UniProtKB/Swiss-Prot annotation:
It comes from Buxus microphylla (Littleleaf boxwood). InterPro entries: Ribosomal_uS2, Ribosomal_uS2_bac/mit/plastid, Ribosomal_uS2_CS, Ribosomal_uS2_flav_dom_sf. This is Small ribosomal subunit protein uS2c. Transmembrane segments: none annotated. It comes from the Eukaryota. GO terms for molecular function: structural constituent of ribosome.
């Protein structure tokens, strides 16, 4: 895998608060190699290491995208939800930003059935067929469609399991992580100072609570995907 330059700036990361971790009492000792200091009861992440692993993640994503691979971005907490959706749409990735439904990947056949139902209901809505049904039936199907849109809207075009999954918050997305581990799907994960760096293939030490921090990391990752996709299109 060729190493590339991704314009990862330490000063920019500091301005975004990427280096701020959790309180020193709320930490995972396995994160010790990624912590540079303690300040006012808060652990400070070593941004040099953040830059290194972020660069490695960008290289991996570029390489995968340039070979036509598919990606899934997962981030369901309120602070991350909108950022995840906009980043995924920009890079034409699948995403989950409301709730990870248990078995979404490990029980893929059930997820596929739900997706087929979702697509059918969307088609019926677009052709105004729902409007021609009895009110009670139409209301029930509209509720069902709304539910499916909330939880499956970001993966509505997904026809197979993703090649790489990007996780925004390890603590919040443990079920998704466990399913990826079970299936052997490679993961890139943002890890704060209370996380386990050994769960993902590439762990990026960063503040996973600040919106500016999440936005910066996601922007770098999806930029790599976009560049990789452009390379894939040029070389087809």
């Amino acid at each position: 895998m060729t190493r590339r330059y991704w314009n990862i700036n330490l000063e920019e990361m500091m301005e975004a608060g990427v280096h701020f971790g959790h309180g020193t009492r709320k930490w995972n000792p396995r994160m010790a190699p990624y912590i540079s200091a303690k300040r006012k009861g808060i652990h400070i992440t070593n941004l040099t290491r953040t830059a290194r692993f972020l660069s490695e993640a960008c290289d991996l994503l570029f390489d995968a995208a340039s070979r036509g691979k598919q990606f899934l971005i997962v981030g369901t907490k309120n602070k991350a939800a909108d950022l995840v959706a906009s980043a995924a749409i920009r890079a034409r990735c699948h995403y989950v930003n409301k709730k990870w439904l248990g078995g979404m990947s490990t029980n893929w056949s059930t997820t596929e059935t739900r997706l087929h139902k979702f697509r059918d209901l969307r088609a019926e809505q677009k052709t105004a067929r729902l409007a021609r049904l009895p009110k009670r039936d139409a209301a029930m199907l509209k509720r069902q469609l709304s539910h499916l849109q909330t939880y499956l809207g970001g993966i509505k075009y997904m026809t197979r399991l993703p090649d790489i999954v990007i996780i925004v918050d390890q603590q919040e997305e443990y079920t998704a992580i466990r399913e990826c581990v079970t299936l052997g799907i490679p993961m890139i994960c943002l890890i704060d100072t209370n996380c386990d760096p050994d769960l993902a293939d590439i762990s990026i030490p960063a503040n996973d609570d600040a919106i500016a921090s999440i936005r910066l990391i996601l922007n770098k990752l999806v930029s790599a995907i976009c560049e990789g996709r452009s390379s894939y299109i040029r070389n087809r």
